[in-house]
């Protein structure tokens, strides 16, 4: 995408680590919530915890591994899947996952509760109550049930992120009414705005519209 003309510039506005922030907020895990509230890098924080070292000793390789673990957990990654992504032995990957849940125990309980609730109700829901039916959650087929369990875990997280960006789109669209700038595209957690160069004062207003779209519980900040 390119600006409409030289009078315009392309503005990309996106959420930072939004799914992990939602995981922290919905689970209420004190360690994860605390990291976000204090503005610490969550991947460095996770690396320090799973490797059992001070944050200032975390190197780039450890941080990348922790990032893979952080996002993998949301999708119910297995030790085998993690070992494939990291290129490490399955035993090492299993230890990383075990250490993760030891360091963030409330996340583990939260995920187990999501599966249990889906088994009872037949659906998972977002923070705003939008439901996704998961009839396969009680399947006798282990493979089908495992996939449904992963859906039950990531639906509240991904679904809440989707709710948030949709609300943000509505807010930004209203904000741009009567201006020469326009919202042109949404990609995952990012909004693209064709911004007129005489309207750069809209940037902080767009940021505020996105930040205020859907406040998260447990004091977890959006930025």
Segments and roles (model prediction):
Residues 1-223:
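Conserved catalytic core of nucleotide polymerization and phosphodiester-bond processing enzymes
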């Amino acid at each position: 995408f390119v600006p409409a003309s030289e009078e315009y510039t392309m503005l990309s506005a996106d959420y930072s680590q939004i799914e992990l922030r939602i995981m922290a907020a919905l689970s209420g895990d004190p360690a994860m919530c605390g990291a976000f509230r204090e503005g610490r890098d969550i991947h460095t924080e996770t690396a320090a915890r799973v490797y059992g070292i001070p944050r200032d000793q975390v190197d780039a390789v450890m941080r990348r591994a922790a990032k893979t673990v952080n996002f993998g957990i949301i999708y119910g990654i297995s030790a085998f899947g993690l070992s494939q992504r990291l290129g490490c032995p399955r035993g090492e990957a299993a230890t990383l996952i075990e250490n993760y849940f030891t360091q963030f125990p409330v996340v583990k309980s939260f995920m187990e509760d999501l599966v249990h609730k889906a088994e009872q109700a037949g659906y998972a829901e977002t923070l705003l109550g939008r439901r996704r039916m998961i009839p396969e959650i009680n399947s006798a087929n282990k493979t089908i049930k495992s996939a449904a369990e992963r859906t039950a875990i990531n639906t509240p997280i991904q679904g809440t992120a989707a709710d948030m960006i949709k609300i943000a789109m509505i807010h930004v669209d209203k904000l741009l009414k009567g201006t020469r700038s326009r919202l042109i595209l949404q990609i995952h957690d990012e909004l693209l705005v064709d911004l007129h160069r005489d309207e750069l004062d809209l940037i902080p207003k767009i940021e505020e519209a996105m930040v205020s779209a859907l406040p998260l519980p447990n004091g977890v900040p959006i930025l």
